[in-house]
């Protein structure tokens, strides 16, 4: 749901400070499995491709990861898809019963030549098998094939999508939305996304997975105080392999491209820390709507 209040900007600053403090505590524990922070994408590390892998039409551009193509004139192009992912496999679970919890945060902006009338299709943060590849463009967001997009038995991916175009042919929602997707383009949980802000200002997303409760929680925030939240139970070990690839996948049907401006990720076997982060996410959303 959309939550907005004139005082929420200050409250969100307080929340983010507390959240980062808690995140640093998670990173400092011996149970941390994977942890990285890209405060921006200006450095040579990202430019040389040592930390980020690009597939399809995704590429590095000074200051950002661009997921889909633009023309020589800088205008986003139709009908293409791309992925930018972390270069190392990420541990998710093992046969002894260990399951990782994780927290990720990233900022992004969407560009289009025809806002807000015709723009499509969006992008997603995803977890998939290490050997997965870029698939179809448009509403498939590079994660699915059109012929099997709604068949969970044919797919293996969990994603949080930022969908700028409602694909009604899949019985999808009839408005832009944020969704949690499990092996299908049809989301298992959604919230309406009044996404005009995404085209003119930076968006910041926070996503947690609590291995104990098996809940994925999503919070999207804007500097103007707007924010959106949703959550859903997803049993990741029943869906994904022990080690996965994580990253971003975007697709276009109309003229749009998506830029990832910053990205941090940490996973841990200490689900208590992630539970605390999740509670802060939910508390922030509830408090700033008062």
Curated annotation (Swiss-Prot):
Where is the secretion signal located?
A: 1-28
Task: Enumerate the InterPro entries for this protein.
Answer: ConA-like_dom_sf, L-lectin, Lectin_LegA_CS, Lectin_legB_Mn/Ca_BS, Legume_lectin_dom, Leguminous_Lectin
Entry keyword Metal-binding: yes
Provide the alphabetized UniProt keywords.
Antiviral protein, Calcium, Glycoprotein, Lectin, Manganese, Metal-binding, Plant defense, Signal
* Regions annotated as coiled coil: none
CDD domains on file: lectin_legume_LecRK_Arcelin_ConA
Residues with an annotated glycan are 48, 57, 183, 255, 270
The entry's protein name is Lectin
Task: Give the organism, scientific name.
Answer: Bauhinia purpurea (Camel's foot tree)
